[in-house]
C-alpha cells in the first residue's frame, strides 16, 4: 500500500488535475487508509457476500458502478462503470471580460482635449493629494469618453485560430443538425472542416509573417499559443466572499506600527532639493510599456505614452511639488494585489502569490528618482551584492561562491561549509525608518530621504479576486511590490550585512544570501560565530529567517575526514544538510561535480523537445523551428 501511495502522490505532484483510477482485488485492504481523499465506487458484493474487488478514484461521483455476470470460471463478478461526470473543460464557466477599443480618432481626441485643458484649475484650493487625485480622475474620465468598451466571452477551450468565419460555420452545422436533413448536415460538416483548415493556415501564416518582419514578440506569442509552452493552469477562484479580506490580512501580516525610537532624518533643506524638468518627464512617459496593466488609478499606459507631450507639464508640476514637500500623494502609492495560485491545488493562504498593480505614473516617477539615488551611492559599496548592479549577474555570484570554496580546498586539512539562507517575505519586512537611516548614512540627501520615508509609509493596499475587492489596509512596513525602487532599496538595506571574520564570505543576490565558511584544522568557531552574527543582524533589522528552508552543504575532500561533522542549529532549530542545492539556477553538489546539474538540464531539454515537435506538426518553416531550438533548448545545454 505504501508503494502504491508513493506512486500516486508522485503522479499527482506532477499533474494535479489528472484523473487517477485504481482498480483490483483489494481483498480486505482499504486504500482510503493511506489516501483518504480517494472515493470508493463498489458498494455491492463481488464474491459471494464479500466486497473484495474495489475501484478508487480521486474524483467523487465520476462513475456509476453496476454488477455483471462473472467471466468464464472466475468466482468474482464483473464490474461495469459508466461515466457520470462532466470533463473539467465542461465544468469551467465561460469567462467574460471588458476590453477598451482604441481607435486613431480616440487618441487624437485625447491629445486635443489635454492640449486645451487648463491644468491650473485642479490645484486651486486643495493640497497635493487633492490636486493629484483630481488630475488622475480627469484623465480617466476623458479616456472613458473617447474609448468604447466591449464585452467578450473567453471560453476555456478557446483556440487561437478560431475566427468569426469558423463561428458562422459552426452555427450553420448546428442548424443543419437540428433540421434533420442528412445531406444539409453532411454539407455543413464539410464546409466546417474546410473553414477550420483555412483558419489554421491563416494563423500559421500570421506567425510566419511576424518572424519575417522581425516582430519577435508576436512570433513568440504565437509559438507559445501553439505549443502551450509556459502555459500554467490556474486554479479556480474560490467562492468564499471573505477570501479577499483574509488574503489582504495575510499579505499584510508583517506590518508593524512606526517606531518612535528610531531617529528620523533631518528635515529637508532647499540645498539638496531635487528638481525635475519637463523634457525628463516627457521622455519617461514616451518609454511607457503600453501592455502593462493599470493600477488602482485606472490610467492606462497607452494614454500616458500617446499624450506625453500634453501631460508632461502637469506631471512635472506634481512631481516637483511632491519632492519639495517630501510628500507622496496616497493615490500614487496605493496598490491592488491580485493573488495568483502557485499551484493548481490551493490548500492554504501561502499557496497564493501576491502580484501588485501600482499606478503606471508612479513607476515613471520612480524611474526619474532612481538615477539620483544611484549617483549618491559609493561605487565600491557592497562588492558581494550581485543584484541590481551594472555588469553583474547570477553567474558572477555563483562563480564567486564556487571559486572561493575551490581556492580554499586546494590547501591541506580544509573543508567548506556553505549555508544557503532563506528569508520569509524579505521585501515585506523592511522597516522604513531603519532603511532611511542607512540611506542617510550612505550620503543620500535629507530631502530625498524624507521623500522615500513618506513613499514607504501609509500605503493603501487592497486585494482583488475576480469581481470581489477587499477593504483597504494601510501599510507602514516593507518595500512595495511592483515598484521600480524596491529592489535597489532592499539591496541598500542589506549592504551592512557583511562578514565579521576574513575566513567567511557572504554572497548576496537580492534576498538570496549564502555564507561560505572556509574551515581549516576542524576549527569551526569563526563560521559558527558568523552564523550567529547573521541571525542577530536579521533580528535587529526585522528580517525573518526561515530555518525550515535554509539548507547547508559541506564540501570535504579530505581522505582522513571525520565520519560525521557536527550539525548546525539556528535558534535551536537544526539546519538540514543536503547533498546538492539549486543556487541561483545552478545545482551545486557536495562533490562539486556537474552530474546533478547536467541531468536536470538534460531533462528540461527533453521536455522542450515536445514543443519543438508540436511546431513541426503545425508545418512551421524551418528557420522558425531553428530559432525556437536555439532559444529554448540549445540555450540551456
Regions inferred by a protein language model and the residue ranges of each:
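Arg/Lys-enriched, amphipathic patches
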Residues: 22-23, 28-29, 86-237, 287, ...
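Short, conserved micro-motifs composed of acidic
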Residues: 29-31, 47-52, 57-61, 66-67, ...
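Catalytic palm subdomain of template-directed nucleic-acid polymerases
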Residues: 31-32, 423-442, 513-539
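Surface-exposed loop/turn segments and immediately adjacent short secondary-structure elements
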Residues: 86-90, 94, 119-122, 126-128, ...
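Basic, alpha-helical interaction scaffolds
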Residues: 105-140, 343, 573-637
